[in-house]
Amino acid sequence: MSSDADAHKVGLIPVTLMVSGNIMGSGVFLLPANLAATGGIAIYGWLVTIIGALALSMVYAKMSSLDPSPGGSYAYARRCFGPFLGYQTNVLYWLACWIGNIAMVVIGVGYLSYFFPILKDPLVLTLTCVAVLWIFVLLNIVGPKMITRVQAVATVLALVPIVGIAVFGWFWFKGETYMAAWNVSGMNTFGAIQSTLNVTLWSFIGVESASVAAGVVKNPKRNVPIATIGGVLIAAVCYVLSTTAIMGMIPNAALRVSASPFGDAARMALGDTAGAIVSFCAAAGCLGSLGGWTLLAGQTAKAAADDGLFPPIFARVNKAGTPVAGLLIVGVLMTIFQFSSMSPNAAKEFGLVSSVSVIFTLVPYLYTCAALLLLGHGHFGKARPLYLLITFVAFVYCIWAVIGSGAKEVMWSFVTLMVITALYALNYNRIHKNPYPLDAPVKQD
């Protein structure tokens, strides 16, 4: 029986590519333009961010070796802090997974408008986005092996322009172009680096992907930690080398208004054909990451449903172990949100929802850091000082990211937390038919 289950699971390389693909997603292709508002000094922001992201990846790597349970942050929060925080973590992360997909598919299909101008029509764009979302829902239903293969191909295609610019872009790199825009933010050095962090801190969302998908990974105790750290390192190298090279290729004034920095850099170096290839690869990278995030939405909901913290329908699986009903529900919700974002006013509001959903992932990150301090207590051995330092750095990384968010985004995130509290009480009453034990003794830990 176990061998049949393992046959549907995936190995180290596909999981590592899923992590790096989920991290880079669509954002990497717009990063140079976003960072151009600060200038070349952004390299310092990258160094700070990479230290924080690596610390967070090491937190997840250690947690997955201590507890290889599927569900990632949800499983850790539930084990260490009880069902309430487990429920809260799962709802936040589940929402973030599929809401983020809606923003990502619009960007990915938008790149395809380079080849099919009709996609610039709002109705055609929306219908195409819905079709693409359902393609990835159906691929997930086929099984995790299928979706990780698709994402592996998509990630490799996305890496073509990124690695190409990171390696060969330096032949067109001009030091004077880079240094002429060293700090164009109008702020002092510290302020400029802080403004950079507001962009770069978000660039590593997805570091937890392997631990959430542990239930479909072969030998998770070994492969999940390696895939987590490996995926972050791949993303970090690609980010720094490619964005720095582009900042030395394209003058700052042009880069700040560029809608396709990688495409512009490729056209500058090799002509229009190269620009078209980059647009295709960017679309493949964006759309390919949809598969991984849809898989995570299904797996985190299934893990909670198995524990009774999500409706039982999310735990129903097919022969491949895929939570079919949960994925179909996610598909319906994504379709509704996709159509609701067609009008200009709704699109503006959805932009806020997308930003809030990113903050949703930071709360599970913070809980995972705290969980490592509890679960690792007495198990770190001589490495205890190192893991305390790593956890502290990861804490600071997450908190700094929240501080850099807008006040409106933080407010709505807090409102969501309050709503989840009420939902937890209703869910408790659904599961427990007997009266609440008023005389139950208070546990002394």
From Swiss-Prot:
Periplasmic topology ranges: 25-41, 110-124, 168-192, 244-276, 343-349, 405-408
Annotated site residues (Periplasmic (proximal) gate) in this chain: 202
PANTHER family in the record: AMINO ACID TRANSPORTER-RELATED, ARGININE_AGMATINE ANTIPORTER
GO cellular component, one term: plasma membrane
Reactions accelerated catalytically: agmatine(in) + L-arginine(out) = agmatine(out) + L-arginine(in)
TM annotation in the entry: 12-24, 42-61, 84-109, 125-142, 145-167, 193-204, 224-243, 277-301, 326-342, 350-373, 385-404, 409-427
Keyword Transport among record annotations: yes
Intrachain S-S bonds: none
Organism (species): Salmonella typhimurium (strain LT2 / SGSC1412 / ATCC 700720)
Protein name from the UniProt record: Arginine/agmatine antiporter
GO BP annotations, alphabetical order: amino acid transport
Record key words, sorted: Amino-acid transport, Antiport, Cell inner membrane, Cell membrane, Membrane, Transmembrane, Transmembrane helix, Transport
UniProt GO molecular function: antiporter activity; identical protein binding
KW Membrane (keyword) present: yes
Topological region Cytoplasmic: 1-11, 62-83, 143-144, 205-223, 302-325, 374-384, 428-445
Annotated site (Middle gate): 293
